[in-house]
Amino acid sequence: MNLYKRGLVVGKFCPLHQGHELLIKRAQDACEELLVVSYTRPEFPGYEPARRERWLRAQFPQAHIVVLDDARLAALCAARGVPARHLPHNDDDGELHRHFMGWLCWTVLALPVDAVFTSEDYGPGFAQVLERHYAGGPVAHVSVDQARAQVPVSGTLVRQDPHAHSAFLSPIVCADFVTRVCVLGGESSGKTTLAQALAAHFETAWVAEYGRELWESQDGILNYDDLLKIGREQLRREAQALLAARRWLFCDTSPMTTYFYCVEMFGKAEQELARLAEHRYDLVLLCAPDFPFIQDGTRRDEDFRARQHAWYQAELARRGIAFVNVSGSVDERVRQVAQVLAARMPC
């Protein structure tokens, strides 16, 4: 039997870490309903409301999730016919934050609580303020791992270097901090070899080219409808690989390549495939066609490779996508990419 009717957990969740998850799970176990509120002012880059909401909803689908910025708060106030307020600043007095939450739960959300769960020393005072706002009964405070003995981490610590503290993050949260690197290139330009070599060098995951896998499974025959299937499956596998990647994910091809082949083979492409081809990466590598051309029975010829390489150059420029040219041997290419990635890492 649940001890409380409706519990409350409040936090920035920038990012959502295992300490937060422990707190929310304990609250869920003790309550019939749970209200989870996230806000921060100012926002932290990379921890936008939509992202925080996605994490919370994925991990706690049964909870009532409210993630706020000033615009979202204004919309809630308008829907209730309540004069809008601004979110309190993170540096404002704690009492102001507590009264803000009392107003939010009672006046804006109409969701009074009878318990608040925290890992902070302000918890008892928070419960007292909420109780005064509701005037409908006591509000209990439940402390969870205040000493950080079970989960020795904080949001401030994780923000300094999410990768160094990835053990305290769920895979869905870690995935949003992975740098996605796409490797493009014409046929027999070494892109698959490079993607594999980079994954081995950086001890992380890579995503193979699904189109080739399907082509081989269908005895070298691809139909028009297969190309959209390839684009969808390539991105599905990419999203799955993000959950296992460490800092970087290397992708052998992208839906833009699938789009190229669809138009090349059939003279047209579905609108959905064109949209999938807009999928963006954090870094794009374009392999120079300076490898000896190897005919493995699936490829065309060197002239086609050169034309495909030129198409990539023109199409990336047309889409406003910056890219890094890589050339030389596999080892030389790995060194080139390592230098680029090192320059992108925080000091």
Label every model-predicted segment.
Residues 266-332, 336:
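A glycine- and Lys/Arg-enriched "phosphate-lid" helix/loop adjacent to the NTP-binding pocket
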Residues 187:
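The conserved Walker
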Residues 23-27, 53-54, 193-201, 229-244, ...:
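Short amphipathic alpha-helices and their capping/turn segments at secondary-structure boundaries
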Residues 160-181, 313, 318-347:
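Charged phosphate-binding loop/patch that engages nucleotide di/tri-phosphates or the phosphate backbone
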Residues 1-179:
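Nucleotidyltransferase catalytic core that binds NTPs
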Residues 190:
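Conserved glycine(s) of the Walker
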Residues 196-240, 337:
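Conserved substrate/cofactor phosphate-moiety recognition/catalytic segment
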Residues 220-268:
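Conserved nucleotide-sensing/catalytic segment adjacent to the nucleotide-binding pocket
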